[in-house]
Curated annotation (Swiss-Prot):
<dbReference type="GO" id="GO:0160147">
    <property type="term" value="F:tRNA pseudouridine(38-40) synthase activity"/>
</dbReference>
<dbReference type="Pfam" id="PF01416">
    <property type="entry name" value="PseudoU_synth_1"/>
</dbReference>
<dbReference type="InterPro" id="IPR020097">
    <property type="entry name" value="PsdUridine_synth_TruA_a/b_dom"/>
</dbReference>
<dbReference type="InterPro" id="IPR001406">
    <property type="entry name" value="PsdUridine_synth_TruA"/>
</dbReference>
<keyword id="KW-0819">tRNA processing</keyword>
<dbReference type="InterPro" id="IPR020094">
    <property type="entry name" value="TruA/RsuA/RluB/E/F_N"/>
</dbReference>
<comment type="similarity">
    <text>Belongs to the tRNA pseudouridine synthase TruA family.</text>
</comment>
<dbReference type="InterPro" id="IPR020095">
    <property type="entry name" value="PsdUridine_synth_TruA_C"/>
</dbReference>
<feature type="binding site">
    <location>
        <position position="110"/>
    </location>
    <ligand>
        <name>substrate</name>
    </ligand>
</feature>
<comment type="subunit">
    <text>Homodimer.</text>
</comment>
<dbReference type="GO" id="GO:0031119">
    <property type="term" value="P:tRNA pseudouridine synthesis"/>
</dbReference>
<feature type="active site" description="Nucleophile">
    <location>
        <position position="52"/>
    </location>
</feature>
<keyword id="KW-0413">Isomerase</keyword>
<comment type="function">
    <text>Formation of pseudouridine at positions 38, 39 and 40 in the anticodon stem and loop of transfer RNAs.</text>
</comment>
<dbReference type="InterPro" id="IPR020103">
    <property type="entry name" value="PsdUridine_synth_cat_dom_sf"/>
</dbReference>
<dbReference type="GO" id="GO:0003723">
    <property type="term" value="F:RNA binding"/>
</dbReference>
<protein>
    <recommendedName>
        <fullName>tRNA pseudouridine synthase A</fullName>
        <ecNumber>5.4.99.12</ecNumber>
    </recommendedName>
</protein>
Length: 273
């Protein structure tokens, strides 16, 4: 039995999230259907992180087990031939049977693209969150960055956890929150050991509230300490959220994600990640 690790990108706008569902309009269902057409047998996948409806991926990782002996390029080219244009394999590589896409991941990174201009941007529809602020208004990105400092380190993120979250513990370690402003655009990067269900979108709701001046930066620390979801801002829209990268022990030689074909090309290039 061979274990294969696979990296893929997808535009989540048209899908009901990653996880397989009866109506089958999910990334997992399209992927496993395409693998079956390529391999001639149904192969089940294990994923690094299940994304919600409307959430995208630049660096999703899966693994599968198979008796097929194919070159890595054959896996990529063959499966891509059956996938819709909004899903694409980027790489495939054989890995030791000890590799596990979910349980061996020690860091995950998410990006969020937020447009704050006074009108919609059709070419970014479904691929960015938006506020449509009046002309001349800007989010206070410095206040948002200041507020985010309380999130760093090992924290109990219960205040930013969805009610249906199945994680055993709300305690996670946040390594970095970075914001970059470029005209009407604000780009955010979140790096952590792992994330709770809706955690990034709930943090986005709070950071945007601070950026609009509805709360001072220190309010976010109060919400974090309270461990009460009712005190946080509403969950922000999924459109601008991207699973950007997943990191594994170096021994497995899992390729880093490539954001060059996305809204984030060059945004965080000179920052340590």
């Amino acid at each position: 039995m061979n274990r294969i690790a696979i990296g893929l990108h997808y535009d989540g706008a048209a899908f009901s999230g990653w996880q397989s569902q009866p109506h089958r309009n999910t990334v997992q269902d399209y992927l496993e259907d395409s693998i079956e057409r390529f391999a001639g047998v149904r192969l089940l996948t294990t994923v690094a992180g299940r994304t919600d409806a409307g959430v995208h991926a630049l660096g999703q990782v899966i693994h599968l087990d198979t008796t097929l002996d194919r070159t890595t390029f054959s896996w990529v080219r063959g499966i891509n031939a059956f996938l819709p244009p909004s899903i694409a394999l980027q790489w495939a590589r054989p890995v030791d049977e000890s590799f596990h896409a979910r349980f061996l991941a020690f860091e995950r990174m998410y990006y969020y693209a937020l447009y704050t201009g006074p009108h919609r941007v059709p070419l970014a529809h479904g691929r960015a969150g938006y506020l449509m602020l009046p002309p001349g208004q800007r989010l206070d990105v410095d206040a948002m960055q200041a507020a985010s400092r309380c999130l760093l380190g090992e924290q109990d993120f219960s205040s930013f956890r969805a009610a249906e979250c199945q994680a055993k513990s709300p305690v996670k370690t946040m390594y970095d929150v970075t914001l970059k402003a470029d005209g009407n655009w604000v780009f955010l990067r979140f790096r952590a050991s792992a994330f709770l269900h809706h955690m990034v979108r709930n943090l986005m709701g709070c950071l945007v509230a601070v950026g609009r001046g509805r709360y001072p930066p220190e309010w976010l620390a109060e919400v974090l300490a309270a461990r009460d979801r009712k005190l946080a801002a509403p969950t922000f829209m999924p459109d601008g959220l991207y699973l950007a990268d997943v990191k594994y022990p170096e021994a497995y030689k899992i390729p880093a994600a490539d954001p060059s074909a996305s809204l984030f090309h060059g945004v965080f290039r000179h920052d340590a990640a």
